[in-house]
Amino acid sequence: MSQKILFATGNKGKARELKEAFKTAGVDVEIITNSDLDNPPHPIESGRTFEANAKIKAHELADYSKLPTIADDSGLMVDALNGEPGVRSARYAGEAHNDAKNNAKLLANLGGIPDEKRTAKFWTTIVVSMPGEFEKDLVVSGTCSGRILAAPRGDDGFGYDPLFFVPKKDKTFAQMTTDEKNEISHRGNVVRELLKVLPALA
């Protein structure tokens, strides 16, 4: 029987990518998400770093579910904007945010900045927590470098994917298949790092 693990997210795009990454790596686990739980908590991401926010989510959901729990916090860091939007990536446009509004704000803030200075990277930190054993948390991080286009390209993906161009693939994340994206993405990279330090799942 596959080991059951909770991925502490309500983001279907993130969940799909993680499941595909584990499948590609040949890891036999059953990954469930917040939507599979009865009235799950909604942690407040009040941390100032990706690791802090991931731990907040992992600890609260592990306590609630009594399952081994994976949580991630990810963000886009744009060099010309001094690392913004960073930990505020999902809420960049304010309380009434959505992907379109976040992307529009990013493009507005990069107005007039030439292509060669629109460099950026995606960053993901994953925390794995066991209920009642938070002192044993596993923490791994992964990145992917690229640049921000002046207009979106592609119909797949989520978040900033249509604007994040990866030169070595000559595509945005939104133009890639899930397998292509997992091969090079921050989340794909962090899952590979996770498997190196998590032999129980490998």
UniProtKB/Swiss-Prot annotation:
Binds 1 Mg(2+) ion per subunit. Its cofactor is Mg(2+). Pyrophosphatase that catalyzes the hydrolysis of nucleoside triphosphates to their monophosphate derivatives, with a high preference for the non-canonical purine nucleotides XTP (xanthosine triphosphate), dITP (deoxyinosine triphosphate) and ITP. Seems to function as a house-cleaning enzyme that removes non-canonical purine nucleotides from the nucleotide pool, thus preventing their incorporation into DNA/RNA and avoiding chromosomal lesions. It comes from Lactobacillus acidophilus (strain ATCC 700396 / NCK56 / N2 / NCFM). HAMAP family: Non_canon_purine_NTPase. Keywords: Hydrolase, Magnesium, Metal-binding, Nucleotide metabolism, Nucleotide-binding. Its EC number is 3.6.1.66. Disulfide bonds: none annotated. GO terms for biological process: nucleotide metabolic process; purine nucleoside triphosphate catabolic process. Substrate binds at T9, G10, N11, K12, G13, K14, S74, F158, G159, Y160, D161, K181, H186, R187. Pfam families: Ham1p_like (PF01725). One of its GO terms (cellular component) is cytosol. Mg(2+) binds at D73. It is an enzyme of class 3 (hydrolase). Belongs to the HAM1 NTPase family. This is dITP/XTP pyrophosphatase.
